[in-house]
UniProtKB/Swiss-Prot annotation:
It comes from Bacillus cereus (strain ATCC 14579 / DSM 31 / CCUG 7414 / JCM 2152 / NBRC 15305 / NCIMB 9373 / NCTC 2599 / NRRL B-3711). Consists of three domains: the N-terminal catalytic domain, the editing domain and the C-terminal anticodon-binding domain. This is Proline--tRNA ligase 1. Keywords: Aminoacyl-tRNA synthetase, ATP-binding, Cytoplasm, Ligase, Nucleotide-binding, Protein biosynthesis. Catalyzes the attachment of proline to tRNA(Pro) in a two-step reaction: proline is first activated by ATP to form Pro-AMP and then transferred to the acceptor end of tRNA(Pro). As ProRS can inadvertently accommodate and process non-cognate amino acids such as alanine and cysteine, to avoid such errors it has two additional distinct editing activities against alanine. One activity is designated as 'pretransfer' editing and involves the tRNA(Pro)-independent hydrolysis of activated Ala-AMP. One of its GO terms (biological process) is prolyl-tRNA aminoacylation. Pfam families: HGTP_anticodon (PF03129), tRNA-synt_2b (PF00587), tRNA_edit (PF04073). PROSITE patterns: AA_TRNA_LIGASE_II. The gene is proS1.
Amino acid sequence: MKQSMVFSPTLREVPADAEIKSHQLLLRAGFMRQNASGIYSFLPFGLKVLHKVERIVREEMERAGAVELLMPAMQAAELWQESGRWYSYGSELMRMKDRNAREFALGATHEEVITDLVRDEVKSYKKLPLTLYQIQTKFRDEQRPRFGLLRGREFLMKDAYSFHATQESLDEVYDRLYKAYSNIFARCGLNFRAVIADSGAMGGKDTHEFMVLSDVGEDTIAYSDTSDYAANIEMAPVVATYTKSDEAEKALEKVATPDQKAIEEVSAFLNIEADKCIKSMVFKVDEKLVVVLVRGDHEVNDVKVKNVYGASVVELASHEEVKALLNWEVGSLGPINVTGDIEIIADHAVASIVNGCSGANEEGFHYVNVNPERDFKVSQYTDLRFIQEGDQSPDGNGTILFARGIEVGHVFKLGTRYSEAMNATFLDENGKTQPLIMGCYGIGVSRTVAAIAEQFNDENGLVWPKAVAPFHVHVIPVNMKSDAQREMGENIYNSLQEQGYEVLLDDRAERAGVKFADADLFGLPVRVTVGKKADEGIVEVKVRATGESEEVKVEELQTYIANILK
């Protein structure tokens, strides 16, 4: 492709609203442009990268036995109502009405549509297992779109769905697609981890996320320093043991703590360590109020609270709700003298506290010498806190460290969550009606492009891995007015294309500095500069990733490039 014919508008300045490298560079290099908040156009170079990622995804999905189809982006509300998610999915689901006032959703995901499709066509175990996938635009009304393609309102996604007669069949396909995902992200050149995850609004139980390691990632990964254990911090169990001291219990005492609300403030004011304080939080668990207790130096993990109750929705009660429903002061919440049918659950660490402190549910007061079970009753002790760096790894090997990650893929074992809700059944080999067992497997294709850009860049621009680069080689005649440079550049361009390389020829009448700056910004793997030594049959070859350059004779160029790109 000749650069003079390409629509690739570059920017010299960093856009003011672009916070992270990938967003900045994809805009500056002319790979995309914003249409509205969280909505982008892919320009020609960006589209080529997107297509490269799509091709890798398709190859690995088909190798894993999945078959491609395409479902509608616009989905009837009745299907979402049938599954129950019309009411529970939340405000991220974009809803609309047609001219006849019939309700629809723009597809945020396609479990309902695929389940409806398969239930009408697959009636026997003989047609199972079946794995179908699509690559299609998705829509989510993000409250705060940010970071360019990493959190948008419109994005390209690969979503696959598998249907099974037995759990063993699901396990087999799940493992196969787990490996396919690992292959996809490895082929894209990414540094990633597969981690144990929470299924969230998707439902189901067993699930893994594929996380690209990056400081700008919105998720925290907890991983072992000596084993391959890795989990989303929400899902990492705490295996620590706590020893209760033999200190004699003291008499409960209520003390004034004026203007002291945070654990750090209270512990400093009372001259007591934070790990002897009891942190109390009120949650709405499917609208039921629950008091959750953790140690003062720990944080409540609401996903674990949700899993304790098998709840659909868990959210922290607001200050106003706590005051109105319980007449408690949020800055001084505590478990003592809790009345009514409000349940108290506590993290294991709370049971070991002796002569601790807690809020008194009264403005400006706390209790000291608090002892669980003597001063208040707990209905259940369980794991309710976030794991911390330095904790023992849940697999028993090593200690936990943290890293940030960008989620680019997610695989779920949905089980019968959707098939039972939507009456999607088949006849088993005994002629009995059974619900289809399902799996779900998603990849953020456009998000993967951003994740690659986030991992592969330097101070001068993008540095694309060869598997996804829009072109393999960038040929730059420095002076297009020089017949020797222009003709050699075109000859190299043509011969490399004949060898199967994708080549970009900078045939613009621009200054050398502009051409080189754009080349660095585009980030193609190899740059061939045709300069003053063209008359001698010598060009300069530069590797973008390393910055290494070398003068090469034209007759040796193809072999030299082949060695770089092998």
